[in-house]
Amino acid sequence: MNPLAPVLTIDGPSGAGKGTISRIIARRMGWHYLDSGALYRAVGVAASWADIDTSDASALVRCTFDTHVQFVEQGESMRVMVNGTDATDELRLETTGALASAIAAIPEVRAALKERQRAFRELPGLVADGRDMGTVIFKDAPYKVFLTASAEERAERRHKQLKDKGVSVNFDDLLREIMARDARDAQRTVAPLKPADDAVLIDTTGIGIDDVVARVMDLLPVPAA
């Protein structure tokens, strides 16, 4: 970790566009990228593979330390390796997202992952995508953004994404899952989902990716040539 490296935090609920926007900006700036949600999902997948009960906090903490996560860029996409296995597709499942949300509510797990996330802070800079990047992990980040969108729009985006991948899912079920996750994330006692006091709020409902990227880029220094 390099405390001198600038950090842009992009927080927000599931489906607000954090991942897409963060990856684009990281490429444009030439900065490192942290998908904190993928870390929680990776621990969830590893725990599932090991048949660990999500109520067993001590076992989950051990799993957190034992799980090796690697981000591998493939063209425009990012593959996530969990203990040497490509778990990208499994990490994107709604069931995995729900599992990650449940695990994220456990204080011991969040504490175990805190330093692993901070270790991504290196020069020339870092774009950190998550739910508590600006409020907990990188409180001193000079650039903070909170993306949001209506639950309906986020469900529509996710529904289209899954449909394009050939995955059949009921829209109403998807909407209910997203709303339930929103409630869990906002109501947990440790690091609840909320914008940092100094974050710039951007509602992406009805706004294209290019427009959102432009708004965020306006907050940052001119990228190095």
Curated annotation (Swiss-Prot):
ATP binds at G12, P13, S14, G15, A16, G17, K18, G19, T20. SUPFAM superfamilies: P-loop containing nucleoside triphosphate hydrolases. GO terms for biological process: nucleobase-containing small molecule interconversion; pyrimidine nucleotide metabolic process. It catalyses: CMP + ATP = CDP + ADP; dCMP + ATP = dCDP + ADP. Keywords: ATP-binding, Cytoplasm, Kinase, Nucleotide-binding, Transferase. Gene3D superfamilies: P-loop containing nucleotide triphosphate hydrolases. InterPro entries: Cytidylate_kin, Cytidylate_kinase_dom, P-loop_NTPase. It is found in: Cytoplasm. It comes from the Bacteria. CDD domains: CMPK. GO terms for cellular component: cytosol. It is an enzyme of class 2 (transferase). Its EC number is 2.7.4.25. GO terms for molecular function: ATP binding; CMP kinase activity; dCMP kinase activity. Pfam families: Cytidylate_kin. Belongs to the cytidylate kinase family. Type 1 subfamily. This is Cytidylate kinase. The gene is cmk.
